[in-house]
Amino acid sequence: MRRIAVIGSGIAGLMTAHDLLKHGYDVTLYSDRSPEDWLNKSRPTGIAARFESSLAYERELGLAHWDKDFPPIEGVYLIFSMQPTIPFIILAGRLSENGAAIDVRLQSYRWMNDLVERGGKLRIENIDIPRLDTISAENDLTIVAAGKAEIANLFERNEARSVYTKPQRKLAMVVVKNTGKFEKIPYNPVKFNFIGDHGEAFWIPYYHKSVGMTWNLLFEAKADGKMDKFTNAKSGDEVLVIAKNVIKELFPWDYDWFKNAELADENGWLTGALTPIVRNPVGKLPSGRIVTGVGDTLTTLDPIAGQGANNVYRMAKNLVQNIVKHGNGTFDAAWMSNTFEEYYEKSGKATIDFTNLLLEPITDAGRQLLIAQYGSNGVSCSGQQVIANAFSDNFADPTFLTSYFTDSAKVRAFISEKTGRHWLPHTAGSLLSVVRDQVRQKIGMTPGAGYW
């Protein structure tokens, strides 16, 4: 039986370890914290939103312990504003299949215990480079799934694929209970607020480790904009107060929903920034031995597109499939590189491109797509609704529509196909509706599109 070590007990490490165990490998998982530490002492690692392909992978491995409990993510409700307090474009899109966001602290606690019960080995210790070298000597393959920890620097930055050299947003996240409900929206959405020069904010239905149904709020502030107020926050209470003020100032349509919100738990918050990066998949140790990586260790994404967890699932599944296919072969540098390239071509590039597109000013093609769907309501069968649903489904599978966002010809053909009309008169009619709703707001009325 081939021995494989996995370093890290987040989603990437645990999904990889469980899949390997299912395929009969001798698996040892190394974690810097115990299951109880994950559950009771840790911060959330992010929004942890995942879509149907990821949830199906959990079911395949017998890890879907919360399928009947979590609040479903049924679609996207997006408000795009050029300036604070004034909606410009509204999109109400439904997902083809529901997604979910589940507290990683609860998952890691349960999945680590599951691993031991199923015959895997668990070691609780901090792993540095010398210790990693020793572990590598004891195993046929060692996989680093340590997220953005210092050990990830063992893997060199891929300059050609890493677009950014510094963080693109200042981030703040808080998990809250005691919110209102979006009763007028006829489905349970991820609610997006995009606002010109200031940043983006997302409200995600979230299954919390002890409270159950909560909301996970993510703020993506552009430096020096009106959302950029979280940097000096020292506690979840401070983040919550700032969040209420930001929502009241920038997104007043959501203030009544949020004004009575409370922290779900004292550790349920984060602030910081990260630099998106793609790393090479071969890490060379001082002894000359090599290890590979999975998840954020190799591809760190800004959370703006909600692709972090989904990217991890795709990469882990591809990695295990290639391990199994490799049989008794040597896990050399060529195998590691080829395995990563297969993931990158199948889904990684599209996922990274989609995420980076949302960090940049909207493209002409993207603008045409948003205008063409204007009037979507989440329930109709109109051409606008079909386009809005397609936009939403790209979060579930970025290979679906990402290439269209930089190709106006493809977008125009897509609009014509989905609406049954030539793209030009359809888009012109939608643009007229946008202008009409701007006039309505100037005279004190709400937009005709959307739910208010």
Annotated model-derived regions:
Residues I7-S9, L21-S42:
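Glycine-rich FAD pyrophosphate-binding loop
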Residues M1-A12:
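Beta1/beta-strand and adjacent pyrophosphate-binding region of the FAD-binding site
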Residues R33-S81:
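N-terminal FAD cofactor-binding segment of flavoenzymes
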Residues E156-K191:
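Central beta-strand plus flanking loop segment that forms part of the substrate or channel wall
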Residues A305, Q321-W452:
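C-terminal helical "tail/cap" subdomain of flavin- and related membrane-associated enzymes
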